[in-house]
Amino acid sequence: SAFFANQDSSTKKALDGDEDISFFGKHQAGITTPMQKACYLVVLDLHTTDKKEVIQLFKDWTDYSSKLVDGELVKKDGSNALLPPTDTGETVGLNPYRLSLTFGVSADFLKKLGLESKRPKLFRDLPPFPKEQLQDKYTGGDIVIQACADDEQVAFHAVRNLIRKGRNKITMKWSKSGFAAIGDRKETPRNLFGFKDGTANVTTEKEFDKVVWTDSKDW
């Protein structure tokens, strides 16, 4: 309710899930971060070609994200209960549960903003896979937000409030939620086919520098 959403984020928290992951660093969190239990992924269409508006949007998202990963509300509202709250309030009383927020953009995003010349050479579509049956409504898009946490509601709350902040410039194209049975994180978790999924994933900084991070001069 609006009443609970208006409560200060210092409201007594649950006893578990108090570990947080910084939003700031050399690389974005959520890429090399140890796997969390839940993920909420959303792809957005961008409806402006104004670079200044897009820059402001990402600044606003940075402000929100830095608070969300610390388990705070995106904004502390005033005492007037008749006004709708800025934060939707689903995480009042919850800890951050290792929430990580990761943002990505597509080649179409760069094209819309006239930034195609900045596109890294290796930034291209994956080749077709045998027998794939892609549906247009689940392909493409301009911006992707990945929210991962050890509590599904925390991940959902983060994405919901980020979208609300930019709703005059973006619309949701598609979204997907998922989970992983990560156990004690000492072993690769099994997927729903019963296979251990990700055993061969790279794990060291040297390997990440080789296959994940780009040092393209154009970027």
What residues fall within each predicted segment?
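Long, histidine/aromatic-enriched segments associated with O2/redox biology
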Residues: 2-219
